[in-house]
Amino acid sequence: MDKQLLIFDFDGTLIDSVPDLADAVNAMLTTLGKAPYPIDTIRNWVGNGSRMLVERALVGKIEVSEGELAKETIDHAEQVFFDAYSKMGGSKTVAYPNVDSGLKKLKAAGFKLALVTNKPIRFVPKILQFFGWHDIFSEVLGGDSLPTKKPDPAPLLHVCEVLNINPAQAVMIGDSINDILAGQNANMDTLGLSYGYNYGQDIRQLNPTEAFDDFSALVDYLLKAYPANN
């Protein structure tokens, strides 16, 4: 079946935002009287939304047990993190190589593009504006736009419904287990990118439809695999 809709993850797929996120996490920890962590440690905590990132930073590990932290503790820390991240202004966030030109090629080829991220939606428009991508995507969802987020398939299915596209005609593209599972749970083709944030696990171990080490290779594949859109 022809593919009409390409649904992209954001952090770790299109942009590397870890330098800003790490600065905000460490600013939060310092404010709370805790020791900061190296950027490479924080990199492995990114991908499940801001609240989980905050929880991991508070306990200093990727696995957080239920009830390990009081809700009030997380709520306060998350607000401190949000305040710090807002002040960062995205100055250290960069687009991965070939992403800007690749997105424009795909849009010009006739695909509809959507963005589904677990990042809080309040931080997304400013980044899109900075990179000049505000008119690239037909639909944009953040991790708090709906009651559930990836790996739940609901955000992907919601995008399909809004854009009136059969889920079988959509492709989920991302760098982590949350993206691949969301796409698989929505019965979509899934395309993995190996360079992002996947907790140290090779994206190919998740059995995506295809996987790529570079965004330009992904674009070439899409243009050849689904030529009806050209």
Swiss-Prot record:
Pathway the protein acts in: Organic acid metabolism; glycolate biosynthesis; glycolate from 2-phosphoglycolate: step 1/1
Keyword Glycoprotein: no
Catalytic activity: 2-phosphoglycolate + H2O = glycolate + phosphate
CDD domains for the chain: HAD_PGPase (cd16417)
GO MF annotation list: metal ion binding; phosphoglycolate phosphatase activity
Positions of the catalytic residues: 9 (nucleophile)
Keyword line: Carbohydrate metabolism, Hydrolase, Magnesium, Metal-binding
EC number from the UniProt entry: 3.1.3.18
Pfam family, one: HAD_2
Cofactor(s) needed by this chain: Mg(2+)
One GO process term, biological-process aspect: carbohydrate metabolic process
Listed GO CC annotations: cytosol
Binding residues for Mg(2+): 9, 11, 175
Keyword field contains Transmembrane helix: no
Superkingdom: Bacteria
UniProt record similarity statement: Belongs to the HAD-like hydrolase superfamily. CbbY/CbbZ/Gph/YieH family.
PANTHER family, per the entry: PHOSPHOGLYCOLATE PHOSPHATASE (PTHR43434:SF1)
Described function: Specifically catalyzes the dephosphorylation of 2-phosphoglycolate. Is involved in the dissimilation of the intracellular 2-phosphoglycolate formed during the DNA repair of 3'-phosphoglycolate ends, a major class of DNA lesions induced by oxidative stress.
Protein name, per record: Phosphoglycolate phosphatase
